[in-house]
Amino acid sequence: MKLMIFAGLVLFAIVSLIEAQAEHEKPCLPEYKVCTHAPGNCCSDLVYDCYGRYKSGAQIGRNCFCLQKGVIYKREN
């Protein structure tokens, strides 16, 4: 009987620890999601990539996105 109670308490402690750890993890950002203010939150299969925005030769801002690793994006005219 004591063994069953002990096993139940150990199981409860393990489940509680797993739930607490999951609550503290930040959800990752999916592909093409803007991550300018959260650079480390892209999902593990994605990379953080930034692009400068220019007007009349002067930089007016910066956009960052979560993009696929190894993919090259080119501007279309």
UniProtKB/Swiss-Prot annotation:
This is U8-lycotoxin-Ls1q. It holds the Pfam family Toxin_35. The keyword Transmembrane helix does not apply. Expressed by the venom gland. Residues 21-26 form a propeptide. Residues 1-20 form the signal peptide. GO terms for cellular component: extracellular region. It is found in: Secreted. GO terms for molecular function: toxin activity. Belongs to the neurotoxin 19 (CSTX) family. 08 (U8-Lctx) subfamily. InterPro entries: Spider_toxin_CSTX_knottin. Keywords: Disulfide bond, Secreted, Signal, Toxin. Transmembrane segments: none annotated. It comes from Lycosa singoriensis. The keyword rRNA-binding does not apply. Contains 4 disulfide bonds.
